[in-house]
Amino acid sequence: LLGGELVEILIVDDGSTDDTAKIADAYAEKYPTIVKAIHKENGGHGDAVNTGIAHATGVYFKVVDSDDWLDKEAYKQVLKVLKKLVEDEKDLDVLLSNYIYDKVERRKKRVMRYHGALPEKRIISWEDSRIRFNKFQYVLMHSVIYRTQLLKDCGLQLPKHTFYVDNLYIFEPMIHVKKLMYLNVDLYHYYIGREGQSVNEKTMMKRIDQQMLVNRTLIQFFSENRKELPPQMYRFLFQYLDMMMCVA
């Protein structure tokens, strides 16, 4: 497995009805010091993330959805950077990298990059005036690698059986982030186009009530914390809210 003993892989079987449990157990048996298979009743995407955080023992935490995948070369670069940070005892709360919209039947792939939004390969704080996200530079779950202890300490609990909670995964922990870094590599392939997928337009229309529930939660959270936010973080979260309102 790429990464070897440097990486702890948690496979969360969230009540799957296919061969997920069998495949997860096979990997855990073959790589007992690397892979953990976690079986639980279905609680939805958010609860699977909660379970992963609760079981994680690594320094950093990355969510990879079952539809998606990571680029091998970019993955190597990310691991190299994170390993060096840990060895040098450098404080970093979140690492941002690029993601690719991998749409079905579309040859040309759109890449979400953050050049110009913040310096590359430098640890900075939200007080840094160079942080300038534009309104088209969406930071999604696919972009971030959080420090595991930050996720545990901030008390993040994504709601069960609710779609679109990945937005809460960005929004709520981010106010606890003191140090961040951008690595300009195309790491995450975000697969779009599977029938019934939560971001499918028809599916989103059917679940607009859940989108609105998440949006109300984001607005309330922002209202309760906005006075304490550094200017750059305030601007980032406000733009994020604006994007979510447009989607809804």
Where are the model-predicted features located?
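Glycine-rich, basic loop-to-helix element that forms the pyrophosphate-binding segment
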Residues: 40-56
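Short, acidic, metal-binding catalytic loop of nucleotide-sugar glycosyltransferases
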Residues: 1-6
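C-terminal subregions of glycosyltransferases and related glycan-biosynthesis enzymes
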Residues: 191-248
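Active-site acidic Asp-centered loop
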Residues: 14, 64-66, 96
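Short aromatic/hydrophobic "clamp" motif used to bind/position activated sugar donors
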Residues: 61
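A conserved acidic beta->alpha catalytic loop
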Residues: 13-22, 43-44
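Donor-binding/catalytic cores of nucleotide-activated saccharide
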Residues: 45, 69-180, 188-192, 196-205
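Active-site-proximal specificity loops/subdomain of glycosyltransferases
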Residues: 33-36
